[in-house]
Every structure is written in C-alpha cells, then in structure tokens.
Amino acid sequence: MATETLDEKTPEVNSPAKEEIDVVPKEEKEVEKEKVDSPRIGEAEEEKKEDEEEGEAKEGELGEKDKEDDVESEEEEEEEEGSGSKKSSEKETVTPTSERPTRERKKVERFSLSTPMRAPPSKSVSIEKGRGTPLREIPNVAHKLSKRKADDNLMLLHTILFGKKAKAQMVKRNIGQFSGFAWSEKEEEKQRARIKEKIDKCVKEKLIVFCDVLDIPISRSNVKKEELAVKVLEFLESPKETRDVIIADQEKAKKRKSTPKRGKSGESSDTPAKRKRQTKKRDLPSDTEEGKDEGDADSEGTNDPHEEDDAAPEEESDHEKTDTDDEKDEVEVEKPSKKKSSSKKTVEESSGSKGKDKQPSAKGSARSGEKSSKQIAKSTSSPAKKQKVDHVESSKEKSKKQPSKPQAKGSKEKGKATKKGKAKAEPTRKEMLEVVSKILKEVDFNTATLSDILQKLSDHFGVELSHRKPEVKDVITEAINAMTDDEEEDEEEEAEAGSDKEKEEVKGEEEEEKAEAESDKEKEKEEPKD
C-alpha cells in the first residue's frame, strides 16, 4: 500500500516546479513588451500586479502542499522501514498481501563436502582348534581342495563350518585350517542341532560334493540324503583320514602309464588291433625291468576302492588274447599233421581195397580200378597242395601285417641282451630252420604249441628268442611246408609204385583167366570125343 500512495503523489510534487519554470519566461516577455510598448505601461502594470497576486496565491498553495507531502513521505518512510524489518525477519513464513497468487520459495540446500562413511572392516574368522586333525593335513582332502575353485559349494561349506561368509581368497585357507567343531559342554547339543539343520537344508547333490571334497567314502547310486547328512556331520565333528590310499600318488602313476601308451598309439595307428595285442604279448617276457615298474604302479593303483583301475582288465584281456594266439598256432601246427595222416589213410585204403577186390570178371573192372586209383591219388595231392598254398599265403600276409614297431623293439631288446652279456650270438634263419625241422620230427603235433617249440629252440641255442617269435613262426611254417612237400612226393611215388603193381596183378589175372578159358575149351572138346 505504501508504494502505491507514493506513486500517486509524485506527479503533484513535480507539478509546481513546471509552473515555476513557465513563470520566468512570462516576466521576461512582459519586460520586453514594456520596452516595445511604452504607451501601454499602465495596462501592463495592472496586468503585472494581477499576475503577481495570482503567483503568490499559487505559491502559498504549493508551499502548503509541499509541507503536507513531506510529512506524508516521512511517515511512509518510517512505515517502510518497519515493514522492511518485519519482512526480512518473516520472509519465509509471511504470505504476500496482494491478491495475485505467488509460489512459495524453496529452501536453498547448501553443498558441503562430508567425508564418506567407511564400512567397518569385516572381522576375520576366529578358527578354534577342534578334536580332529586339520583338513589341510589330510592329504586327500588337501589335494581335492587344491584342485577346486572357491565356488558356491565351498562358500556354503564355509558358512556351515564357521557360521560366516568370507572372501573367495580366504575360503579354501579357512576350510583347510578347520579341525572340528569346538563346542562347549553346556551348549553342545544346541550347536549340533543348529549345524544339523543347516546340513539338512542342503540338497543331495551338495552333500555328495561335500563328501567328495572331504574324501568321505559313499556309494552314489543307493545313498539316501539322511545317510549323507549323518556322515558329513560325524566327519566334521572330528575330521580324520578315511583311507590309506593317496590320490596324488595314484594320479602320478596313471600319468606314467598313459605317456608310453600315447606314444605307442601314435606310432602304430595304421596297424590292426590284433597285431598290437600280439606285440604286447611279445614284449612281456623280454622287458622284465619295465614289467616290474608297471607292476609296482599297478599295486599302488589297486588299493583305491573308489576309482576304477583300468590296468587289471587290460592285463586280463592281454592274457586272454595271447591264449587265443597260442591256440591259433596250435591249430596251424595240427593242420599239416592231419593232412599227412589223411593222405596216408586214403592211399592205404585205396591200395587195400584194390588188393581185396580182385574179381575174375573182366578187363573193364581192372581199368575202372586203375582210373579210380589215379583219381584218389590226384584228389589227395590236390587238397594238400591247396592247403599248402593257403598256408604260405597266410604266413606272407601275417609277415606283411606285422608292424615296424616290434622290429624296433626287437632291436632294442637285442641291444639290451648284448649289453647284458655278449657271450653267445643269436642263430641265423638257416640254423633255426634246421633245428626246427629236427624238432618237428620228434614232437607230437597234437599237443605241441608254438611256445613249446620256441622254448626248445632257446634251450638249444642258449639264447632267449621270445623277441623273435614272429620270425620263429615263419621258420616253423617253412619247415612244415618242406616236410609236407617231401611227404607228397613220397606218396606220389608210392602211388605210382602201387599202380605198377596193380597193373602187373591185373595182367597176371588176365593171363590166368585166359589159361582157364583155354583149359575149359580143351575140356569141352575132349568131352564129345569120349
């Protein structure tokens, strides 16, 4: 309101000043007029007086008005000062008196650099000593912990053991230091019940993982969740070793075994599986030192009940395969003997039947007998020859299929043998052939095996020949083939001799028949004469 009154009164204050400004030029004009118009001085004086009177009256009015304005302005200033002090004190709370709507002022929030509140450092887990051995001192548990990452399973196990979570870096270390629950005697039952509840809340898969980490023996197929929970709780009360077998040593032994096997498979990948198995058998008697090392490794490996050892079934399969190979060799040795006996029997039967069936009937029967004897001789010789050819071809194929690796092994073994003792040189192929032919004449083919002949050869020469087993096999087949050839030649000669005898017998029979016929004719002639 004070501001409005001031604005209204300001033009009244300024108005007399304008009038005064206008008064001065009028007086000057009047003086000039008096000078110009001297005759009109009287009139001018009168007018002047009138003007002066009017001016005085106006000045009086203006003076009064100025005084009133000054008083009002002073009052307004005082009011403004009072209202200004009040407004300054009550700026935020007082609403404006005007009818126009106004928004309330927002409070100014001053920026202040406040130091950030640091989170209190997490208390390190206090690990008390329990009744059992620390988990890091149990070799199998330490080995399995070292191979695992600090995943959710280990974090859960940590919370069960210590009742707190920890950083991923500290989880495995803390679990390794755990040596059992340190319960007070008074609260032992309560604390056991709490931990049992925590373990029961876990899923069966989690409990199986705990058993694996803590090296607790379980059968995964038939185990129930309750049994797993009981076993885990019993172990955690007083941890200790569950078995004597150390997994780390076992894995090292497996690595030793796997490295040479990989080399073998890489070298002889093109060779057939049967030949590989035969080479394994050949290497068994010669590599005694390697066999001992592998045997020790196998003995360590078989102690583990949880992990399946592949060594034992492999050895059994190798033995079975070697037995089958020996049986095959026996069959091959028995075949030529059967051939010999069958050929002899057929020749004897043919000769015997021919000797017995002497009919004094006609020449046709004799000719048919000769033809049949020739056919039998041919038939006996032809299957023997076919079998011989097949046998030679099979031996050639076997020699071709034999991998280059056994030869290399044989050379290595030869080197070992020469290093051990260079007393006797190994026999040549010709020498072996001569001795084998002698042995085959003495040996019974129905019972003899390749290993028996090989043993006799090694005894004869005083040298171990197991690494030359394929070569010995070829030598035996050669000797058998030579023997069968000789026997076939003998049989052919015997057959030819038998056929000559038969021819002579037939001729004698024919002559006898002729003589009998002539004698009969003579008798018939003599009878009518009588």
Swiss-Prot record:
Gene3D superfamilies, alphabetized: Homeodomain-like (1.10.10.60)
Keyword terms of this UniProt record: Chromatin regulator, Coiled coil, DNA-binding, Nucleus, Transcription, Transcription regulation
Stretches of the chain forming a coiled coil according to its record: 41-61, 185-205, 492-527
Stretches for region Disordered: 1-130, 246-430, 482-530
Domain of life of the source: Eukaryota
Summary of subunit composition and partner proteins: Found in a mRNA splicing-dependent exon junction complex (EJC). Binds specifically histones H3 and H4.
Protein name: DEK domain-containing chromatin-associated protein 2
Organism: Arabidopsis thaliana (Mouse-ear cress)
Gene for this chain: DEK2
